[in-house]
Amino acid sequence: MKTLQTVHRKLFDQKLAWSQIDKKKALAQPEQLELLREACLVESYLPVYTGKMMALFWDDLNATTIFTIESIEAYGHYYVLRRYLETIGYKPVSDEEVVELRERERGVIYTDRVRELVNFMGTEHFAAQFFLDMSQLLDEPVLAAILPEFAAEEVVHSQFAFDLLQARIRKDPGARSEILEHARNFKHVGAYVRPYVPPAKGDNVRSIRAFNEKFEKLLGQPLSDFLVEEVPDAVR
């Protein structure tokens, strides 16, 4: 499809110096490549996910603008990661694999705006940390150089969701309890279609702490405080 190839070149191909990729360095880190491949698969699902979110928020102009931006930037991440894996010759992602993944949740219709915003906010928060950590773990410099940009985009996406949730609270202070309930049951969007979404580093405490602080800004109290309140006195 020549037109699509032209758009790819214009929007995404210039992001990396493809001819300068050090394949030897890249292939020397198979554990990190597996993580990148998993991230690529999750990103491949997001155009379908954002389509569902557009349907859910069809009458919210700010939200639909936000998910349009998310869809474009998530696709950019997917495209770059997929082409990178193909370029270095490490387990290229196939069209069939992407379609099979997208099919897993094809019949699901989102109905709870708060639940999806909470899950989206958390997903993008952890995705930002993932790409930042990967940029520090990779020895191959070409991809490592672009991943902080991916991380910065994910930070903005998470803030988008925060802003939408904050607007709901301003309109209805009672929304705090609903947000809290979904925060307790947070689910990574990648886990909608994948069995497990691994962090880049085993120690994810810093990112979890920052997630807790995000809820403190939103709800006026850290999420951890609410969770402690639910623990019976006998086990404290």
Q: Where are the predicted features?
A:
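Non-heme di-metal
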Residues: 1-236
